[in-house]
């Protein structure tokens, strides 16, 4: 999959003049009728409670910075919108930019102080890292690898729902990779833990950044081998086989979960394969 051209990440010098900025507070990202990117000079005059600033990349060639606020505040003519809403609608390249910004913001908030000694850290110029001088310790943004797998049995697909899902929605099985575990081992383990089913013919299908708050989703397809579905207590509210012509409400169109399902439906029908966003 080719790298997105409209949005590219970079470590920019916050001392450089000009450019645009996105603003994140505890209510999401600031936006107005023109979008989420504001001239840095204009933002400097808004008396915002800025906790930190980061140069995050280029959007259509324009340098973009991130202002992380101590809290969300009212700005005339503007509103706040959560990251998930940007994922569901609008320009996907903007969501990619904001997803990156959100992960940088999470990292900056969580590593203001050293976890070893408790002293304040400083940003390393030209590198996406915080530094504790006392412990000579570099602290990088956290990325949590996780897997998501669509298990199929001919014209049936195995879908499950978590108690956290919106009412009626089902999705593919997913879980986090454990230390010392390969992604493939994780798939087999999670499927067994969540529904007591054995799988075979595992195929990697693609990956997607999932900035809620810092996951990297590794997508797989697998075929059913054996076992009867037994949902994992407290984790899985319901799990069952669905015929491809009679599916329940599914995850958002731009999610890797939806892509895995749509890709299998296309494969069964001979339709063109969908494109995985991101």
UniProtKB/Swiss-Prot annotation:
It is an enzyme of class 3 (hydrolase). Transmembrane segments: none annotated. Keywords: Hydrolase, Magnesium, Manganese, Metal-binding, NAD, Zinc. A divalent metal cation 3 binds at residues 190, 194, 235. A divalent metal cation 1 binds at residues 174, 194, 235. GO terms for molecular function: magnesium ion binding; manganese ion binding; NAD+ diphosphatase activity; NADH pyrophosphatase activity; RNA NAD-cap (NMN-forming) hydrolase activity; zinc ion binding. Divalent metal cations. Mg(2+) or Mn(2+). Binds 1 zinc ion per subunit. GO terms for cellular component: cytosol. It catalyses: a 5'-end NAD(+)-phospho-ribonucleoside in mRNA + H2O = a 5'-end phospho-adenosine-phospho-ribonucleoside in mRNA + beta-nicotinamide D-ribonucleotide + 2 H(+); NAD(+) + H2O = beta-nicotinamide D-ribonucleotide + AMP + 2 H(+); NADH + H2O = reduced beta-nicotinamide D-ribonucleotide + AMP + 2 H(+). Its EC number is 3.6.1.-, 3.6.1.22. A divalent metal cation 2 binds at residue 190. A motif (Nudix box) lies at residues 175-196. Its cofactor is Mg(2+); Mn(2+); Zn(2+). GO terms for biological process: NAD catabolic process; NADH metabolic process; NADP catabolic process. Residues 141-264 form the Nudix hydrolase domain. Zn(2+) binds at residues 114, 117, 132. Homodimer. mRNA decapping enzyme that specifically removes the nicotinamide adenine dinucleotide (NAD) cap from a subset of mRNAs by hydrolyzing the diphosphate linkage to produce nicotinamide mononucleotide (NMN) and 5' monophosphate mRNA. The NAD-cap is present at the 5'-end of some mRNAs and stabilizes RNA against 5'-processing. Has preference for mRNAs with a 5'-end purine. Catalyzes the hydrolysis of a broad range of dinucleotide pyrophosphates. Belongs to the Nudix hydrolase family. NudC subfamily. This is NAD-capped RNA hydrolase NudC.
């Amino acid at each position: 999959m080719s790298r997105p051209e409209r949005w590219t990440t970079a470590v920019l010098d916050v001392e450089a003049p000009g450019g645009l900025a996105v603003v994140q507070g505890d209510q999401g990202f600031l936006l107005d009728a023109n979008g989420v990117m504001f001239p840095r000079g204009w933002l400097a005059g808004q008396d915002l409670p800025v906790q930190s600033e980061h140069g995050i990349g280029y959007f259509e060639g324009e340098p973009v910075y991130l202002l992380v606020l101590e809290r969300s505040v009212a700005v005339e003519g503007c509103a706040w919108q959560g990251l998930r809403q940007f994922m569901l609608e609008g320009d996907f390249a903007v969501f990619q930019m904001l997803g990156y910004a959100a992960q940088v913001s999470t990292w900056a908030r969580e590593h203001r102080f050293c976890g070893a000694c408790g002293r304040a850290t400083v940003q390393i110029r030209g590198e996406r890292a915080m530094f504790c001088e006392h412990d000579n310790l570099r602290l990088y943004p956290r990325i949590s690898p996780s897997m998501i797998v669509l298990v199929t049995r001919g014209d049936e697909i195995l879908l499950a729902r978590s108690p956290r899902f919106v009412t009626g929605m089902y999705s593919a099985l997913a879980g986090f990779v454990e230390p010392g575990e390969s992604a493939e081992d994780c798939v087999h383990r999670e499927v067994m833990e969540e529904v007591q089913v054995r799988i075979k013919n595992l195929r990697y299908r693609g990956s997607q950044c999932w900035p809620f708050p810092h996951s990297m989703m590794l997508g797989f397809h697998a075929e059913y081998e054996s076992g009867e579905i037994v949902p994992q207590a407290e984790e899985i509210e319901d799990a069952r086989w669905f015929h491809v012509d009679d599916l329940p409400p599914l995850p958002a169109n731009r999610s890797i979960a939806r892509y895995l399902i749509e890709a299998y439906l296309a494969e069964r029908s001979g339709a063109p394969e969908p494109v995985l966003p991101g």
